[in-house]
Amino acid sequence: MKLQLIAVGHKMPDWINAGYADYVRRMPGDLQLALTEIKPGHRVAGADGARARQLEAARILAAITPGAVRVVLDERGTQATTRELAGWLENWMGEGLTPAFVIGGADGLDDSVKAGAGKLFGLSRLTLPHALARVILAEQLYRAACIIKGHPYHRD
């Protein structure tokens, strides 16, 4: 199963890239986590970021695999345990669906990205830096995969 991660931002710090790469490398062989980095929209000084979010939205929507379940990360989204996340993955696998996880940039996400989401998912009630959210999501997807596979990484 392919897991798609679409994230606004590029030129991440080395420690972000290393953390993300570590969980991708550890992912079980039948699960692949593929990252698509979206170039941030140009933000005009003094503007509210709406135009930048619209540009990013067009790039995000173009990057999503056709037919994928769009899972948009949002601080107001559904909170879930890792076991619940594993259940979502199992259901999507059983239905032959590709989940496309979307992480917005510094200005958040345009409503058009959220509107078509199959699920709004909150990693935390805390507001997380978008770069760090990549690493946390990769770890949680790895942990969920371990639950599905019966690997002892996750302990209740």
From Swiss-Prot:
PANTHER family registered for this protein in UniProt: METHYLTRANSFERASE, RIBOSOMAL RNA LARGE SUBUNIT METHYLTRANSFERASE H
Transmembrane segments: none
Biological source species: Thiobacillus denitrificans (strain ATCC 25259 / T1)
Family the entry assigns: Belongs to the RNA methyltransferase RlmH family.
Name of the protein in its database record: Ribosomal RNA large subunit methyltransferase H
Primary localization class, coarse: cytoplasm
Catalytic activity: pseudouridine(1915) in 23S rRNA + S-adenosyl-L-methionine = N(3)-methylpseudouridine(1915) in 23S rRNA + S-adenosyl-L-homocysteine + H(+)
Recorded GO MF terms: rRNA (pseudouridine-N3-)-methyltransferase activity
Assembly with partners or alone: Homodimer.
Residues binding S-adenosyl-L-methionine, per UniProt: 73, 104, 123-128
Gene field: rlmH
Record's GO cellular component terms: cytoplasm
Reported function: Specifically methylates the pseudouridine at position 1915 (m3Psi1915) in 23S rRNA.
